[in-house]
């Protein structure tokens, strides 16, 4: 203990102040995280700091001082020290970890790759014209391994080609040509390593939520819950109307099929009996025209006319259905509005 006190006494005051400042920032914000800043230009970091100033505080400090501050705060906070690696900055916010992750992803922008840098993925130059007129640029592209020629008075790439595979170092000539072609293979920004919120540590794999899929999952879950409630006859505020309608339809069907003479099914029973009667009469008339009287003949004629009219009306109904298709587009817009509402959940 004496040795630790002796060591502490020799810490410069500016370091003590820095440790206290980190502790105060952690305690005054709901969430804090650690981000990788290795390889990011100072100007880019300053721009990100300005862009986030209304929602987050970005602080760059020495890892050793950050570690001391975390250890002094105790509880589960010291577990965040395992995310201190190479060049690390701290970020503080009162937003949720999900919102913080999304904000940091939005800071990322395409950036040119330097000579000697390792390609994070295959670098592909697409076939097509460039903005360059014929000149020395043609030879420069070819010497960089980019197949180029003159086409319609412009330098053009003759074929789509992988000019550098993932994991390979980018040659000097190729790096120069990629910048001239405005091909930026790197995505530069702050990578969140972890976020701490009220005793819980969130890693980026958990925070990378696909909002479209999440929205679809919620819709599907609601539909499944609704169907389960209806099929198991479990009444809720959302399903009681459907359950009552289903019960009414099933009871009416039972009454009709069992020929139960109740006021609620008499119309259906009479309609069913009428259909059966006309069917029998029609078959009898086909065998013997004198088998039915004039009244039945009139009924059969009316039924035949109705059937013919229905046949003529079918194409018109199909056309009307096509005219109703714009309503489906309105439903799509409604779903998009729903997704926008879900987006607000994550910022």
Curated annotation (Swiss-Prot):
Keywords from the UniProt entry: Ribonucleoprotein, Ribosomal protein, RNA-binding, rRNA-binding
CDD domains registered for this protein in UniProt: Ribosomal_P0_L10e
Gene Ontology MF term list: large ribosomal subunit rRNA binding; structural constituent of ribosome
Gene Ontology cellular component annotations, sorted alphabetically: cytosolic large ribosomal subunit
Biased segments, Acidic residues type: 325-338
Domain of life: Archaea
UniProt keyword annotation of Ribosomal protein present: yes
One annotated GO biological process: ribosomal large subunit assembly
Region annotation (Disordered) ranges: 310-347
NCBIfam families linked to this entry: PRK04019.1-5 (NF003098)
Purpose of the protein: Forms part of the ribosomal stalk, playing a central role in the interaction of the ribosome with GTP-bound translation factors.
Family: Belongs to the universal ribosomal protein uL10 family.
Assembly and binders: Part of the 50S ribosomal subunit. Forms part of the ribosomal stalk which helps the ribosome interact with GTP-bound translation factors. Forms a heptameric L10(L12)2(L12)2(L12)2 complex, where L10 forms an elongated spine to which the L12 dimers bind in a sequential fashion.
Name under which the protein is recorded: Large ribosomal subunit protein uL10
Protein source organism: Methanosarcina mazei (strain ATCC BAA-159 / DSM 3647 / Goe1 / Go1 / JCM 11833 / OCM 88)
Organism placement in taxonomy: Archaea, Methanobacteriati, Methanobacteriota, Stenosarchaea group, Methanomicrobia
Encoding gene per record: rpl10
